Amino acid sequence: MFESKINPLWQSFILAVQEEVKPALGCTEPISLALAAAAAAAELDGTVERIDAWVSPNLMKNGMGVTVPGTGMVGLPIAAALGALGGDAKAGLEVLKDASAKAVADAKAMLAAGHVAVMLQEPCNDILFSRAKVYSGDSWACVTIVGDHTNIVRIETNKGVVFTQADNAQEEEKNSPLGVLSHTSLEEILAFVNAVPFDAIRFILDAARLNGALSQEGLRGSWGLHIGSTLAKQCDRGLLAKDLSTAILIRTSAASDARMGGATLPAMSNSGSGNQGITATVPVMVVAEHVGADDERLARALMLSHLSAIYIHHQLPRLSALCAATTAAMGAAAGMAWLIDGRYDTIAMAISSMIGDVSGMICDGASNSCAMKVSTSASAAWKAVLMALDDTAVTGNEGIVAHNVEQSIANLCSLACRSMQQTDKQIIEIMASKAH
């Protein structure tokens, strides 16, 4: 069943997962600004005294209401300040992992003194944009990130331009391992998962380790909305059944609770999002435990889940009005279905039912309530799998669901790419009005 050699397509799949599934400490939008601030601070000899920052509307949306790990505070200003004063620019999405208590205190003092300003970049044609300009005495440094949470495109100081990334987006897309996703299919992904050597994908077990630890932390503490721990209490009170469906709901919610509540543990992200990584991981872990899967089966199921989630999300804008926990849960549905019967038809039916169920869920910014959407998406994924196991699914006669799963995915993604752009603007306007 398993092949010893890795063909070029499979190698591209592996590289795509390695590119998109990475550890991240804290919600990735404020972390992107923290990284810009840290990288700018690294260009200066003195201590940063003041910060001006500019972000895209989508990054503002996802940074307004989320807790920054280790600070107990929400928002982009504290992320920028802590990045500048205690961040490690070389750590990427884990830029704040070694921030000291002193750095946190200094960052809070900088905010209290009114020395941090975060503004909308206007006009802004980029969905993901963050720029931090930091000052120390008469010196300054400015770093700009565009397109991806860690993609630094320009570094400039008062002495001149230090670095600029050439504008070769088409060439980068051609050379990117993600480029293969534009001309592949779920069937090819499944064939890869079924036959690739275990040693080549063993690394994906780190997702189970990191996101499993977040789930345990979420159940121990009162993080965020503490959905997971609250539902666990309702089980003890006899108000909720202690079964597999509930375990998926509770353990997935708990990981997102800890993530959004500011726990100082990294998540294994997917497509630039910790919650997407959690959603693609934890439900699969729970089902794998239930069926007694060994590490190899778990790795294959996780690879199917994460790669399917990446495949779907690759057809979306990096950030949009569509809650991407839903698309990550489509990956989880594939992984869970594979663990139980392994048939392509079951996987396809489960994803189609997901599209017919949760496709209208909006993204109204990163916050503690993301855990609600993560839990809803995980529950919907398991429901879709249970239906598919009995050869039942939302069909092409209903709504945006088509007669084949690939077209259903394309239909869903076309909504986010085109029709939901005005929705996104309205969401941002509503959130901005609340901030004043």
Curated annotation (Swiss-Prot):
Pfam families on file: SDH_alpha (PF03313)
Highest taxon listed in the record's lineage: Bacteria
Cysteine disulfide links: none
GO molecular function: L-cysteine desulfhydrase activity
Signal peptide: none
InterPro entries given in the database record: Ser_deHydtase-like_asu (IPR005130), UPF0597 (IPR021144)
Gene Ontology biological process terms from the UniProt entry: L-cysteine catabolic process to pyruvate
Transmembrane segments: none
PANTHER family, A to Z: UPF0597 PROTEIN YHAM
Family to which this protein belongs: Belongs to the UPF0597 family.
Protein name in UniProt: UPF0597 protein YhaM
Source species: Salmonella dublin (strain CT_02021853)
Gene assigned in the entry: yhaM
